[in-house]
């Protein structure tokens, strides 16, 4: 049984479970049994395995996990043509992300410095100018704590942020955590993802990491998640070092 924190997240997750198990394959995601809209609750089948974030693995094993994650991510992104409404939402996603991150500047207790805000706004402006990027159905929170390892492979859980969007937001958390000091994991992911990112997508991904850094100091405390807060601070510090004159 899952209880979502808002009607928006409940609606997203319920919709995702309406077909994601077919898209990803047997045992690769929970299956929806029944939904209780009045309680924002979903009754789901159990998925075998344990969170990858808790696993003790060597470099080769982690690369294997990222290959499987790349395969599941590709299946989700290529799940089928978006209808008119979903495509409109997906194509507006990057502008919406820039607008949403701007709002976080005004509500976070750990407010970025003036220089940090200037760097962030520069990336937000660049993101708005990138133009059309490949879109699809994204997981929205793809990372090891939402990957379950079991003998037959890997499963995805927690689909409350699943939505139509540009595809690159699914790579942001991996880019600023898993891949940052482990380039072999990134390479393994893209070996099975099916294609390399375009130059515009790589640039968009960098811009989105800046937005994530600004979101984290607000989103972390909101969800009592110190890991998210720390992630934002690390990313912002790195961006400031890279943007020194």
Where in this protein do the model-derived segments appear?
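An alpha-helical support segment within catalytic cores of ATP-dependent transferases
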Residues: 59-63, 78-140, 232-235
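Conserved protein kinase catalytic core
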Residues: 8, 51, 147, 164-166, ...
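A glycine-centered beta->alpha junction motif in the catalytic cores
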Residues: 43-59, 102-107, 210-227
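ATP-binding pocket architecture of kinase catalytic cores
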Residues: 1-88
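Glycine-rich, phosphate-binding/catalytic loops in enzymes
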Residues: 17, 60-61, 155, 172-174, ...
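Active-site activation/catalytic loop segments of kinase-like enzymes and analogous catalytic loops
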Residues: 169-197, 209-226, 237
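Active-site acidic catalytic loop and adjacent metal/ATP-binding pocket
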Residues: 124-171
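Regulatory N- and C-terminal appendages and interdomain linkers associated
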Residues: 242-245
């Amino acid at each position: 049984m899952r209880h979502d924190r808002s009607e928006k997240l409940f609606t997203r997750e319920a919709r995702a479970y309406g077909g994601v198990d077919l898209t990803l394959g047997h045992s690769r995601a929970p299956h929806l049994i029944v939904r209780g809209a009045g309680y924002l609750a979903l009754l789901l089948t159990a998925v075998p395995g344990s969170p990858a974030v808790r696993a003790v693995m060597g470099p080769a094993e982690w690369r294997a996990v990222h290959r499987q994650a790349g395969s599941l991510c590709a299946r989700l992104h290529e799940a089928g043509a978006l209808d008119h409404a979903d495509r409109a939402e997906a194509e507006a996603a990057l502008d919406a992300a820039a607008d949403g991150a701007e709002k976080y500047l005004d509500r976070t207790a750990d407010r970025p410095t003036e220089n940090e805000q200037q760097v962030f706004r520069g990336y937000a402006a660049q993101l708005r100018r990138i133009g059309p990027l490949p879109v699809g159905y994204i997981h929205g929170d793809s990372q090891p704590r939402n990957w379950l390892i079991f003998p037959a492979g890997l499963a995805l859980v927690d689909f409350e942020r699943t939505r139509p969007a540009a595809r690159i937001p699914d790579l942001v958390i991996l880019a600023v955590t898993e891949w940052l000091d482990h380039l072999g994991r990134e390479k393994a992911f893209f070996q099975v993802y099916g294609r390399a990112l375009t130059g515009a997508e790589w640039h968009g991904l960098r811009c989105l990491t800046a937005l994530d850094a600004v979101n984290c100091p607000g989103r972390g405390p909101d969800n009592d998640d110190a890991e998210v807060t720390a992630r934002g601070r690390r990313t912002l510090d790195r961006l400031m070092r890279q943007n020194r004159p």
